[in-house]
């Protein structure tokens, strides 16, 4: 297989050869076995077009818009495609909110002094509570408890009762437009019920109605789930601030006990770092024959952690995104893989057996065939649970290398991570004016929020994302990166000071003056909400310029799963030009395609652009940014 069909990253390319030599199932070979993209392509053309449905016993049905061929119930291809998209959106929103629910649970128990965590950012707690209209005259614990009560009450509002969180946090112009469209949301639970119920057979088959419900759900998700989640995690674990972090597979050293918290929830990861930094745990590891004990960040759980806590010899580094997972597990450097919500592959038990590591589900969402033992996260028991996990890892080290050699000599780079609204303001001297001045002068043409996964659909891991971002910064467009795509940028070296050499002259000069890279590591996919709040602040700083008129865009060069689809729908509701790749499974729905790629501009101000070529994709983004600059007279 061609190296670039595997991955952009040399480390993963090399590990693929090891995995092949070991005759292990892997994501690349499984992709090829599906016949996807082959000649001929063996995918079902109706499935690829989104023109099929199997929700009821009359089906499976296929539809063809060119012949007005409908499902047995009478639903059109447009309705089929959008209904399935809305169901994906519900899955994405639900999973985002599961994380939020666990964060609020953790904050409440921390306020009651029942967890190993603390309120690390009392000022952030007060600032956020004050924005929500919560009394901040009491103790930090009282404020935190009142905050938990306030947001949970809002989450549980019925869909017909407007969300207070959205009312308070969203930009005024956006709220007005959402009210006009009838998509101002209620509570997130009510919105998920409304959306899911709408997808029942013979309920809502109208693609426009379904699309508006998707936007409504996306708005509720972004403000209630994402913003509340990230800001409350800031309160508990720290506001992201810039610092360097080791990245890539070279952070794995087989002579250490290596623990990998993996998924999207950082709670047990942070608890393990706190314990592992204590001398007694290092001594336990050394008594087992290791040089020490390390916690290695992985995927989005790791991204949440590295944004907030600095590296040392215990919290040692970050591996990469989800397609790197089998490469990491096959390294024979892992002792414990703690799998929380999201992004732990179903084949992990096969890798655990082959490469001698302990696989432990730590979320009630996660299960693996053949793995009966589990340790579901409980904030009150978090320290005890973390200790059990570290003990498992130390015990595993004794036998890890009994049946094979570890992979050695992999590269490790450095990335600057930890950008947030607060840290950007700090870098700018406490005001957005320097950034706005750079945009007004043209030194920075515009800003792109890159919220992406990684996928093998058209290219190897991260190949397309890196190509798009390199092209953006070459054209003096600043990038804020989030999600698995953020890991792509970090490991590819684009979040380092040296990446300024890829930037256009004026962006390079701004980055040098501010001491930042041209790609700002802005967090996880959940930080989409944080980005929306930043755009609201920029809109306000410019005197209320509508978000659709800002020289900004969203990009998902390698979206993959259901969370990504709700992020994209929210971006459209927010009024953003939104670039996505691969081609979504809606091409058999011509009216829906027209709605998303043309008519949406008149509805919300947003627009979906789909393009598989990196240069053409950036051409579209740049053209949009230049049009907005012209409209603003800058």
UniProtKB/Swiss-Prot annotation:
One example of a Gene Ontology biological process annotation: generation of precursor metabolites and energy
Q: What is its EC number?
A: 1.2.7.4
Binding-site residues for [4Fe-4S] cluster 1, renumbered to this chain? 44
**Residues that hold [4Fe-4S] cluster 2 according to the record:** 53, 56, 61, 73
> What keywords sit in the KW lines?
4Fe-4S, Iron, Iron-sulfur, Metal-binding, Nickel, Oxidoreductase
Listed under catalytic activity are: CO + 2 oxidized [2Fe-2S]-[ferredoxin] + H2O = 2 reduced [2Fe-2S]-[ferredoxin] + CO2 + 2 H(+)
Q: List the disulfide bonds.
A: none
| Pfam families xrefs | Prismane
Q: Does the record carry Oxidoreductase as a key word? A: yes
> Would the keyword 4Fe-4S turn up in this protein's UniProt record?
yes
From which domain of life does this come? Archaea
Q: Cofactor(s) for this protein?
A: [4Fe-4S] cluster; [Ni-4Fe-5S] cluster
Q: Where does [Ni-4Fe-5S] cluster bind?
A: 264, 343, 453, 484, 525
Q: Which GO terms describe its molecular function?
A: 4 iron, 4 sulfur cluster binding; anaerobic carbon-monoxide dehydrogenase activity; hydroxylamine reductase activity; nickel cation binding; peroxidase activity
What's noted on cofactor binding? Binds 3 [4Fe-4S] clusters per homodimer.
What note about domains is in the entry?
A: Cluster B is an all-cysteinyl-liganded 4Fe-4S cluster; cluster C is a mixed Ni-Fe-S cluster which is the active site of CO oxidation. Cluster D is also an all-cysteinyl-liganded 4Fe-4S cluster that bridges the two subunits of the CODH dimer.
Please give the subunit comment from the record: Homodimer.
Protein family according to the UniProt entry: Belongs to the Ni-containing carbon monoxide dehydrogenase family.
Cited function: CODH oxidizes carbon monoxide coupled, via CooF, to the reduction of a hydrogen cation by a hydrogenase (possibly CooH).
Which protein are we looking at?
A: Carbon monoxide dehydrogenase 2
What gene is this protein translated from? cooS2
